[in-house]
């Protein structure tokens, strides 16, 4: 059984690597959702290199020890090294963060926005230039690698870029492509429904 499991993991690794030529993903912010995404990506070897920036050194130490990721306290260093850059911070921090990194990102970088209420247009406006942006909303079951994520693409994103990002979100659950106009509704339903299910289970247990 152990050999079969290893074979399955190897097949997943091959399949993910066939989806993208991008080698490095970076995370700015390593809260619960960021950690869940990092775990799925590292377990499935979606990228050769994972960079993580966080203001709490203890978070970085844990992630480095557990997954071997590269860590930094500098947002700029992570931005400079990332082919795909996930902005995993609270919505209120987006303007200041992007102002810090906007001149440091690679020209063909894919920005992944996972902040509720921050649109693709908002991100482009903060960067002050036309840049590839993907809006994504994972939900809390990501913490047990069972997320149901919604993703939306801007017009600059290629088919290869789409496959790359879908491989990210499929690594810790499943994902569906939706129009960005539907993202608020998706957030309300998929973001809140797990909490209701947990309440049902707790009530039944009582």
PLM features per residue range, with description:
Residues 122-132, 148-185, 196-206:
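Internal alpha-helical scaffold of NAD(P)-dependent oxidoreductase catalytic cores
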Residues 20-71, 77, 146-147:
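NAD(P)+-binding Rossmann beta1-loop-alpha1 motif at the extreme N-terminus of oxidoreductases
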Residues 5-20:
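Short, Lys/Arg-enriched N-terminal segments with co-localized hydrophobic residues
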Residues 193:
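Aromatic-residue-lined binding/catalytic grooves and analogous aromatic/hydrophobic interfacial grooves
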Residues 67, 75-80, 84-87, 91-151:
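Rossmann-like NAD(P)(H) cofactor-binding subdomain of soluble oxidoreductases
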Residues 189:
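Catalytic, metal-anchored helix/loop core of enzyme active sites in primary metabolism
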